[in-house]
């Protein structure tokens, strides 16, 4: 089942995926990740299952380090345990604020945890902020690897200003 289509990505982002070890046929066993995360209370959904089977374990370097309003100088690492172990309360907060069912898939800037929602939305969260990576998994790859649009802060905890500001110029 193809719940997303990586062929829709820009050639540069596809090249970064390939350089990280991805191939169109790639499907790996994800049981070793899913069992400990389910033990913490996460519920695997079909999109998260496909994301992890297709790109789990990969670390993808950015192709553009200067986003419109953020420095994109860290890789997108698909390690669901690093993103999710001990972070179930964070996922529950995201679910309460945004609705939906979120499953951890990896880490991005400043080790923020990346979660994919059953309906497709991808967010990153950490340090009191929640950011929109994309309405689809493909959009999240374009942003996190290609820095092709501004990073949008969806939520800031009390006492924090949204980051990055929409008028911030990076790099």
Describe the predicted segments one by one.
Residues 157-168:
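Long, charged low-complexity regulatory segments
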């Amino acid at each position: 089942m193809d719940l997303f289509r990586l062929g829709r990505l820009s050639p540069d982002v596809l090249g970064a995926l390939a350089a990280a070890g991805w191939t169109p046929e790639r499907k790996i066993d994800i049981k070793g990740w899913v069992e400990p995360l389910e033990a913490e209370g996460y519920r695997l959904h079909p999109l998260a299952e496909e994301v992890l089977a297709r790109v789990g374990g990969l670390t993808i370097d950015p192709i553009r380090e200067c986003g419109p309003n953020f420095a994109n100088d860290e890789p997108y690492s698909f390690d669901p345990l690093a993103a999710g172990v001990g972070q179930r309360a964070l996922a529950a907060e995201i679910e309460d604020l945004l609705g939906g069912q979120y499953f951890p898939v990896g880490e991005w800037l400043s080790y923020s945890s990346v979660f994919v929602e059953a309906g497709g939305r991808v967010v990153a969260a950490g340090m009191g902020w929640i950011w929109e990576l994309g309405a689809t998994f493909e959009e999240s790859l374009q942003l996190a690897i290609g820095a092709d649009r501004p990073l949008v802060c969806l939520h800031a905890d009390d006492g924090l200003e949204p980051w990055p500001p929409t008028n911030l110029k990076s790099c």
